[in-house]
Each structure stands twice: as C-alpha cells, then as structure tokens.
Amino acid sequence: MQCMNWNKLTEKGSVEVMEQEEKRKAVEALLADCSEEHLWACIVAFQGEPLRTMSGLPYSYTLKEGKHGGLTKELWVDRRENSKSITWSSVRMAFQNVLKMKESLSEGEKPYVKRPKALGDIRGISYIYPLFDRFGLIETDPDKNGKNGIQLCLQLEEASVHNEAEANTEGETT
C-alpha cells in the first residue's frame, strides 16, 4: 500500500515539476524573443494558473480543444459561474501595444503600465494585463521587487527543485 502512495506522490511531483519547467521555458523564450509564437506558448503553459485582476479578483483561464484536436485560440476565463471568453485577437492587440511601448525603451527594459486600460480599450484587458505582468512583459508596480518574468522563472525553478527534493524524501523512514 505504501508503494502505491509513493508512486502517486512521485508521479504528481513529476507532473508539477514538468509544468513548472514548461512555464519557465516559455517565459524565458518570450523574454528572449517577443514573438506571438512565444506569447502563445506562455498562454498554453499558464492555463489553469491562479491569477488576480488589478482589483484583486481571482480568476484562471483554460483553452478548449477544437474540432480537429488542436487548442482553440480563445481563453475561457473562469471567474464566476459563467465563463467569459477572450479572443486571441484581443491578446494580440494588447501585445502589439506592449511592443510599441518597448520601442522607446533601452534593451531589456520593460514598459511601466500603471493600469490595464493603458494597454488599450480592448475587450478582456483586465484579464490580459495580469498575464503580461506574470510573463514579465510589462512592469505594473515599481515596488514589486521583480515578481515576474525572469524572477518568476527563478522562483519556478526553485520551487521545482524543492518539490523534487521533497518527493525524494517522503518515502524515506527515519
């Protein structure tokens, strides 16, 4: 019986480590090359991740599978009983605005975006804004001490190492 529980813990830990690694790699790729392909990889990797709007409302999003087995380019925000959809075109529009903001900045600098509407009058922007913050595309709070982008990657890496170490010691007896 103990072996079965250990296997489940190890399997769960491995899945979590793989998910964290996928998120880390997606963010690193996006920050190295701000392309729509890398943005989409981040969107896919972070689905189901607990997020908060600027006003503090919790939400997460999922991507649904299309007719031919691929993911649809529509984010389904799960905040209440009814889900709200955000189209890929809305995400792209906001992303293009971020890229325009970056043009006037020095290399590696992120645009400071005080409020979601500063990215444009785009449907679903209050849900897109925290995503861009989480991915490290924008700076939303100068006093945040870097809890996004590369810093998030490092935190995810640290968490996966910790989870791996925990999973390896849970089966040991003292």
How should each PLM-predicted stretch be described?
Residues 133-144:
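A short, conserved structural fragment
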Residues 112-114, 135, 151:
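Extracellular-facing segments of soluble proteins and assemblies that are Gly/Ser/Thr-biased and enriched
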Residues 144-172:
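Short, cationic-aromatic polyanion-contact patches
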Residues 5-36, 161-174:
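Non-catalytic accessory regions used for complex assembly or targeting
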